[in-house]
Amino acid sequence: MTDKIHNFIVTGGCGFIGSHLVEALTMHGQNVLVIDDMRVGKVKIDTANVKYLHQDVASAIPVGKFDAIFHLAATPRIRLSQTDPFGTITNNFNSTMVVAEYARRARIPLFFAASSSTRFLHHHDNPYTFSKSMNEELLELYRKRFGLEYHMLYFYNVYGPREADYGEHSTVVRAFKKCVESDQPLRIFGSGKKERDFTHIHDVIDGIIQLLTSKNKPKHVHLGSGNPVSIMDLAKAFDHSIVHEFDKKGEAEVTECADPYIEAEYDVISYVKKWKSDFEEERILHNVNKDLRKVEKKYAKTDSGQ
């Protein structure tokens, strides 16, 4: 990345995307302070050049000199925001305001903030995307009035290792994996024709590291594959039973990265098919080992005269 060691703050650094970013930064020899209350993300990277503040972003007080902030902490998911609009908007806006003000006072030269690909699609249709659009308005104010250099990172249905796998925080890919693992049918809301621009976490992180080394950093950084896939096609790749349920309101029909900053190496359909093949092999091996243990136990009893 660079021969110079920098000091980074990563809010939400225990989450899915955040933990991968922290890991990548440390692998490049950088120092990282993670601010995360660990209510959602639980992953900690155990290396000497990472320190943790287990506090709410809005109340944390970082100590030290920092070169850049990655503000990834947020209340995620459109569906969650429908049941708690006040909490979503308040948390997402307040945390961004606090971090932006800290960056202004500390004169931190680089500020990267996570936004949502849905922010460009009817951003007043749900509390989550509304909160993200408010965050951008706030950062633009800080740029014009106080000279804060910020860059918006747009994520497009990120999947891969460490993806959230519980409740409404679960990604679509992980939710389908869990159904296969528990031998339950895949649940599709509506017709399954909705399209999403699924992007592997490794492609996303490679794009962020590339951004850090670039002299000309765009204001809007779209970290998507540029190849949207329908939910139905994704489900079919799992080669598993499917059930349809009533559609959920407030979600876009198509989310596409029209101007990708990265050249995605991973393809979600190929990824899913490989995962399913590996899962089937592991299940067969598990069953074989289970049967062998039964046979060994039976012969052990015979040898002992029982």
Whereabouts are the PLM-identified features?
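Active-site helix of classical SDR
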Residues: 131-134
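Conserved Rossmann-fold NAD(P)-dependent oxidoreductase catalytic core, especially the SDR/UDP-sugar
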Residues: 71, 90, 94-129, 151
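C-terminal substrate-binding subdomain of Rossmann-fold SDR/epimerase-dehydratase oxidoreductases
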Residues: 181-306
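Conserved beta-loop-beta element that borders a ligand/cofactor-binding pocket
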Residues: 115, 138-162, 187, 242
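NAD(P)H-binding glycine-rich loop region in Rossmannoid oxidoreductase-like domains
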Residues: 57-91, 118, 122
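Flexible, glycine-rich beta-alpha linker
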Residues: 119-127, 154-171
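Rossmann-fold scaffold of SDR-type NAD(P)-dependent oxidoreductases
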Residues: 11, 67-72, 113, 222
